[in-house]
Structures are given as structure tokens and as C-alpha cells.
Swiss-Prot record:
It is a peripheral membrane protein. Part of the ABC transporter complex PstSACB involved in phosphate import. Responsible for energy coupling to the transport system. The keyword Membrane applies. Keywords: ATP-binding, Cell inner membrane, Cell membrane, Membrane, Nucleotide-binding, Phosphate transport, Translocase, Transport. It comes from Prochlorococcus marinus (strain MIT 9312). This is Phosphate import ATP-binding protein PstB. Its EC number is 7.3.2.1. Its main location: membrane. Residues 14-253 form the ABC transporter domain. GO terms for cellular component: plasma membrane. The complex is composed of two ATP-binding proteins (PstB), two transmembrane proteins (PstC and PstA) and a solute-binding protein (PstS).
């Protein structure tokens, strides 16, 4: 990607500088400043409608696919403003991967779910080795090594989600975004995904949106609490904002903002 003159500290892999995001005339989130540390798992939490998923999707330009969505401010990744007109969004999404709320394997074999994305991104190495490595990192190899030619749809929901994680890993991203990856899964599958995340943080930076407070507490190093306030014109609409960002331990044990304490204690949400 094209380098800009912007600089961030070495341990900061991604930075939002005064980011506001709108859908047409509706402002969804306003004036977000946030730094994501390399090698950390960061949770984005907050009530429905506060803009946390909108912010997550902005980190690899997935919002570009939504008509009339616009962003003001700067999103810096590796010294580059990813919203610079010269930057290829496809390359951004290769380096900053995404795992969605619902498992969405390709209608292909387990093997091809991994190989397909790598192939179209120009991978020319040992594909068998890449498939095995990706599945191992996603803690799925032992469960499917003898049925790689079976359809990805033949796997359970939790296995499908880990297949999607393996598919993301295969194209060698630096950051993995996860939008409520466990919301459709049972507790055992959720635990397996969380264990996988802890293994992945040794090689990747992970940013996750979750409504599950216990999950945020279990998996993340840092937590960003988003909230929403009514528009100044009083028309009933709300705009999201970053209310507090700190280590997960401090957010849950000694938050600075009263609204943070009220949210994590279940008083609203």
C-alpha cells in the first residue's frame, strides 16, 4: 500500500483519528479517536445502535459496499491512510481480514474453502501445506483432516466458524476483525473459538465486537465501550461515540465513566 507521511508509535498497528461515519444524512458514529496495539485482542462493546459494528467494518473498508456510507477522519494502518483514493480496498481487506457473525463457508469442499482465497490472491506455494497450517491455527485440523473433500456445509456451526477463521488466516492478514463471531454458537463452540483466539494473538492483532460481557472479559486485553446519545435537534435519533477505552481489567473493575459501569452491570443495553 502507499505510504503517507503520517506516523504512529511502533506498537500501534491501527489508529482512528477523529472518525465520523454516516449513512446518507444519518450520522451513525461521531469523532472517534482510538489506537489499537499490535498483538492485542481488543473488544468493542456497547448497546445496540451505538456504532461499534459500523466502526469495525470501517477498519477494512467493508462499509464501502454499503450505498451512501461515508467516512470523515483518518484510519491509519501501517503508516497508510486506508481511505486515501490511491489505496486499493481489496489489498486492505487482504491485510485486514474479517470473520462475520454468521458462519459463511463457500459452497465448496473444506480444502477449497482455504485454497480458493489463497489462490485468487496469488499464492503459488505448497497448497497442501497452507491448508493444513491454516486449519491447525484455527484448531480444526484434527477434526477434519480425514474429510477435506467434504463440503464445508457438512461441518457443525462452530466448526464452520473456525473454517471461516482458517480461510481468513490463509491469505496472511495482519489483523483479524470479528463481528460477534460466537453469537450464533452454543457454549462449547464459543469456548473453542475463544481458545482459538488466544492462540491466534501470538501472530495476529484481533479486534472483536461482542455483546457478551463475560466473553470480552475472558478474551481481550483492551476494551472500547461505545454508547449513543440523542441528536441535538431532538428528533429521536441517536449517534454513537466512544465513551471509554482502556485495559479490559480497568474497564470492568474501575471504569472512569458512570455509563460504562451501568452498562457492564446490566442496567441498560
Amino acid at each position: 500500500m502507499i505510504k503517507t507521511n503520517k506516523k504512529t508509535p511502533k506498537n500501534i498497528i491501527l489508529s482512528l483519528e477523529n472518525v465520523s461515519i454516516s449513512y446518507g444524512t444519518f450520522e451513525a458514529v461521531r469523532n472517534v479517536f482510538c489506537n489499537f496495539k499490535k498483538g492485542n485482542i481488543t473488544s468493542l462493546i456497547g448497546p445496540s445502535g451505538c456504532g461499534k459494528s459500523t466502526v469495525l467494518r470501517s477498519l477494512n473498508r467493508m462499509n464501502d459496499l454499503i450505498p451512501n456510507c461515508s467516512l470523515k477522519g483518518t484510519v491509519l494502518f501501517d503508516g497508510t491512510n486506508i481511505y486515501d483514493k490511491r489505496v486499493d480496498p481489496v489489498e486492505v481487506r487482504r491485510r485486514i481480514g474479517m470473520v462475520f457473525q454468521q458462519p459463511n463457508p463457500f459452497p465448496k469442499s473444506i480444502y477449497e474453502n482455504i485454497a480458493f482465497g489463497a489462490r485468487i490472491n496469488g499464492f503459488t506455494g505448497d497448497m497442501d501445506e497452507l491448508v493444513e497450517s491454516s486449519l491447525r491455527k484455527a484448531a480444526l485440523w484434527d477434526e477434519c483432516k480425514d474429510k477435506l473433500n467434504d463440503s464445508g456445509y457438512s461441518l457443525s456451526g462452530g466448526q464452520q466458524q473456525r473454517l471461516c477463521i482458517a480461510r481468513t488466516i490463509a491469505i496472511e492478514p495482519e489483523i483479524i476483525l470479528m463481528d460477534e463471531p460466537c453469537s450464533a454458537l452454543d457454549p462449547i463452540s464459543t469456548l473453542k473459538i475463544e481458545e482459538t483466539m488466544h492462540e491466534l494473538k501470538m501472530n495476529y492483532t484481533i479486534i472483536i465486537v461482542t455483546h457478551n460481557m463475560q466473553q470480552a472479559l475472558r478474551v481481550s486485553d483492551m476494551t472500547a465501550f461505545f454508547n449513543a446519545v440523542e441528536y441535538e435537534d431532538g428528533d429521536g435519533g441517536k449517534v454513537g461515540y466512544l465513551a471509554e477505552f482502556n485495559s479490559t481489567k480497568k474497564i470492568f473493575n474501575s471504569p472512569k465513566e458512570k455509563t460504562t459501569q451501568e452498562y457492564i452491570s446490566g442496567k441498560f443495553g
